Each structure stands twice: as structure tokens, then as C-alpha cells.
Amino acid sequence: MRAYLELARPINCAMAALGVVVGELIAGARLDVGAVLAPVVAAVVCAGGNAINDYFDAEVDAVNRPDRPIPSGRVSPRSARMFALGCFAVGVGMATVINRMCLAIAALNSVLLYLYSWRLKGTPLIGNVMVSYLVGSCFLFGAAVGQRPAPAVWLFLLAFLANLVREILKDLEDVEGDAALGLKTLPIAYGEGVALRVATVFAIALAVLTPLPYLDGVVGWPYLVLALPAAAVILLASVLAVAGSWDAGKAQRVVKVGMLLGLLAFLASLL
């Protein structure tokens, strides 16, 4: 049982569930069966995604992480794959109890998690886009349960852009290791300069879009107090990385701080 818990990565699953709860709060969800089930669905689907990732990464983990459940022999590759598919099936099945939108998101995310681990990890930009969608979709999933989804939909969009910036910066930080594994990330395929400029374009888009939830009337002024500094922090990190003043590792850590500020901005809008 412990080996399967390691395969599922419970901390990651808890973070996915928390993202759904935040989406529900922002979207004004009522405390009912759907609101209770939605975080559980997210955690179960996330567990499936983590397990299928370990299944496809078994050879790499045998060298870099021999203590992981599959290379250590505690879980067979076939059992890991069946566990992942079982998690996807259970998650999608539970989503049918909530509503059609939640069912669609759970089914789509299950397919994307499989495809990402099987074929799309390490592909230029596509992998980054997919991960960023999956991160933001936790808020979208929560929004699908709520009575006023507009604020959480904005959170999904802004979280998608912010995470996209961070994912590209992380690829820049991991160039040496990714190249050794044969991955074709954006900086490996097109150069570090191109990757930095692409990250900055997404950071600019984030800064431009940040005031729109307030201007759209879906959040109040407390949102702006934290959201504008959050966007500025993310843009500054990208610009300083392009200028060479910061390395990619420092920049992506600062972007993470900006993302936390942005999340707090939406929670502040509830006040």
C-alpha cells in the first residue's frame, strides 16, 4: 500500500484538491455533494497522472531515482499502469455525479495526463502549455461547481499564463539534465535566448490581462492591491532573466512568489 501511495504522490494530489477548493470558494459554490466530491475527483485523477508518469519514466528513474516504487521492484510496471488507469476511471466515474462540465474536464485531463507522459513531455512549448493548462484546470474544475464561475475562470487564465512563464524558466534551469535525457524542450530546440523572449511575451500578456477581472466587474478593488504587484513581480523576473541579471533558477522561484500573490489576490476579492 505504501508503494502505491508513493506512486500517487499524495502531496501533489492534496495541492490539486486545494486548487479545486479555491476555485469553488471564488465561484461561490454551495456546500453540497458536488462541492465535496470535486476535490476528491481532482486528487484521484492527479494520482493517476503521477502513476502513469512513473510508468513511462521507469527507465530514467532506474538511474536517477532507483528508490521509486517501479525501479525498486515494489510495484511492477503493469501494476503501476493498471493503478493509473484505475484512478482515471474512478475519477471520471465520480465526476458523472457532479455535472457535465466536471465530467468533461475530468475526462479531458485524464487523457492529457496520459498523452503528456507518453509522448509530449519535453516537446518544445507543447509540454509547457499542457502542464500549465493542467495546473490552471484545478481552478476551472472548482468553478464548474460554483454559482458564479467568472472570477475562477479569470483565475484559470491568469494562472495558466503565469505557470507557462515558470515552466519555460524551469526548462532553462534544467537544460543540461534534459539534454542528457534526450528531451527537446524549448531552450534545447530553439536556444536559450528564444526561450527567454517567449517567456517574457507571456509575462507581458499576463500583465496586460491582470486588471481585466476588476474592469469586468467580477472582482473588487482588494484584488488589484495584490494582483498588480504579482504581475509586476513575474514580468520583472522575466525581464531580468533576459537581461542576464538573474539566472533562470532565481527567476522561476520569484515567479512562484508572484503566482502565490496572484492566488491571494483572488481570495482577497472574497472579502
From Swiss-Prot:
It is found in: Cell membrane. Its cofactor is Mg(2+). It is an enzyme of class 2 (transferase). GO terms for molecular function: geranylgeranylglycerol-phosphate geranylgeranyltransferase activity; magnesium ion binding. The chain crosses the membrane at residues 11-31, 33-53, 88-108, 125-145, 149-169, 201-221, 224-244, 251-271. The keyword RNA-binding does not apply. The keyword Transmembrane helix applies. One of its GO terms (cellular component) is plasma membrane. It is a multi-pass membrane protein. Pathway: Membrane lipid metabolism; glycerophospholipid metabolism. One of its GO terms (biological process) is glycerophospholipid biosynthetic process. Keywords: Cell membrane, Lipid biosynthesis, Lipid metabolism, Magnesium, Membrane, Phospholipid biosynthesis, Phospholipid metabolism, Transferase, Transmembrane, Transmembrane helix. Its EC number is 2.5.1.42. It catalyses: sn-3-O-(geranylgeranyl)glycerol 1-phosphate + (2E,6E,10E)-geranylgeranyl diphosphate = 2,3-bis-O-(geranylgeranyl)-sn-glycerol 1-phosphate + diphosphate. NCBIfam families: PRK12882.1. Prenyltransferase that catalyzes the transfer of the geranylgeranyl moiety of geranylgeranyl diphosphate (GGPP) to the C2 hydroxyl of (S)-3-O-geranylgeranylglyceryl phosphate (GGGP). This reaction is the second ether-bond-formation step in the biosynthesis of archaeal membrane lipids. Belongs to the UbiA prenyltransferase family. DGGGP synthase subfamily. This is Digeranylgeranylglyceryl phosphate synthase. The lineage of its organism: Archaea, Methanobacteriati, Methanobacteriota, Methanomada group, Methanopyri.
